[in-house]
Amino acid sequence: MATNLQDGNTPCLAATPSDPRPTVLVFDSGVGGLSVYNEIRQLLPNLHYIYAFDNVAFPYGEKSEEFIVERVVEIVTAVQQRYPLALAVIACNTASTVSLPALREKFAFPVVGVVPAIKPAARLTANGIVGLLATRGTVKRPYTRELIDRFANECRIEMLGSAELVELAEAKLHGEPVPLEELRRILRPWLRMQEPPDTVVLGCTHFPLLQEELQRVLPEGTRLIDSGAAIARRTAWLLEHEAPDAKSSDENKAFCMALTAETEQLLPVLHRYGFPTLEKLPL
């Protein structure tokens, strides 16, 4: 079935008939959450997936906590009204650090968040120096400091906050090349260190999309760690043990908050990830 672009009031193409499958929402401010979705899909290929991204308010890294909580609850509510959910994954580090309590209070289905993979990084580092690459919001939030104090208090944590990397990842998915000189400029504080981090936590779901380029710029042998595989395992456990029986036989679907020329450019990418249609989600 060809990928098509639809607004919220346009009837969808007929869904491909299939057995009912648990419906799982994966949400991000942008398309970085596709990296988490891909890990979940590899482990759990036979689910009904909804991918929603907030291209109107993107990026979240510089937004206030109050705005993020209200916005994420509003979007998840709108999806739940259309498709009863078995589980939701907030595939955005920034949103996860502030919105999970409100979401878990409002909804009966499990809500999985994404947090920086500091704990495994602290176990893997050989030189005791761990880099945290995240948005500026994630770097500044108390939740991140709590993770470090709890799981990596014997390591030296070098934090680097960047909104530009998010933009570069989005541009890459739109087909634009990633300028390595720009990456070197962003990572310069680490590249100038006499002993740089040997293990780097990708603390934003956009950043695994830049893994190849990051490995070309960082010192040889630097480990890059993200939480995608752990989120997939957690999703599988919750679906088996705690999720409600919310199923659909519809095809996978992607939602954005506004249809634009940029979202139209994403159609081939979404199709490759298994989303044949993209709609505007009415809020």
Curated annotation (Swiss-Prot):
Q: Name one GO biological process term.
A: regulation of cell shape
Entry binding sites for substrate = 28-29, 60-61, 93-94, 205-206
Annotated Gene Ontology MF terms?
glutamate racemase activity
Q: Which catalytic residues are annotated? A: 92, 204
User: Which pathway does it serve?
Assistant: Cell wall biogenesis; peptidoglycan biosynthesis
What EC number(s) is this enzyme filed under? 5.1.1.3
EC category name: isomerase
What keyword terms does UniProt attach to this protein? Cell shape, Cell wall biogenesis/degradation, Isomerase, Peptidoglycan synthesis
Coiled coil keyword on record: no
Q: Which reaction does it catalyse?
A: L-glutamate = D-glutamate
Q: Does the keyword Transmembrane helix apply?
A: no
Q: Tell me, what does this protein do in biology?
A: Provides the (R)-glutamate required for cell wall biosynthesis.
Q: Which PANTHER family match?
A: GLUTAMATE RACEMASE
Protein family membership: Belongs to the aspartate/glutamate racemases family.
Listed name of the protein: Glutamate racemase
Gene name per UniProt: murI
